[in-house]
Swiss-Prot record:
Superkingdom of source: Bacteria
Protein name as it appears in the record: UPF0260 protein ESA_01462
Lineage: Bacteria, Pseudomonadati, Pseudomonadota, Gammaproteobacteria, Enterobacterales
Cited InterPro entries: Puta_zinc/iron-chelating_dom, UCP006173
Family: Belongs to the UPF0260 family.
Pfam families associated with the record: CxxCxxCC
NCBIfam families: PRK05170.1-1, PRK05170.1-5, PRK05170.2-1, PRK05170.2-5
Length: 148
């Protein structure tokens, strides 16, 4: 008999730090820069990748020291999760907080990121290097329906 996966038997608050970290599918969507309108606080999504994001692997080059390299890097925690309304509907943290299960392509279910990349969930097919961008406003993406 197989054991029920931890994400189905524990709440987000009950998970260990290692379990919490493993929920991240590594899609890189958090690592794309967002612009905020100073007057309306509206968030605009771009395809501009953080300098630390390896676009091919969708992994941070310096994850353990990312805040030293990128002071504006976000740290998603159990406490601040509700404030990140811009998280995509595919995000495991968002899904589990909403009482949903992980999608079939999630690396915790498949054992690899290949299915996630094949489903085009990751940013590897849209991300551009920050160093190659002159005007970030030229890289604003159409607002996803889920971000309404």
């Amino acid at each position: 008999m197989t054991e029920t996966p931890f994400w189905q038997r524990k709440t987000l608050d009950e998970m260990s730090d290692a379990e919490w970290e493993s929920l991240c599918d590594g899609c890189g969507q958090c690592c794309l820069h967002k612009l905020m309108d100073e007057d309306t606080d509206e968030i605009y999504f771009t395809n501009v990748a953080c300098r630390q994001l390896n676009i091919k692997t969708c992994q941070c080059r310096n994850y353990e020291r990312r805040f030293e390299y990128e002071p504006d890097c976000i740290k998603l925690t159990r406490e601040n999760l509700p404030t990140f309304e811009w998280l995509p509907p595919t995000c495991a943290y968002r899904l589990l907080a909403e009482g949903k299960n992980l999608p079939l392509w999630h690396p915790l279910r498949t054992g690899s990121k290949a299915a996630m990349h094949a489903e085009r969930i990751s940013v590897r097919h849209i991300a551009v290097k920050e160093s190659e961008v002159r005007d970030w406003q030229d890289h604003i993406l159409n607002k996803p329906d889920w971000a309404e």
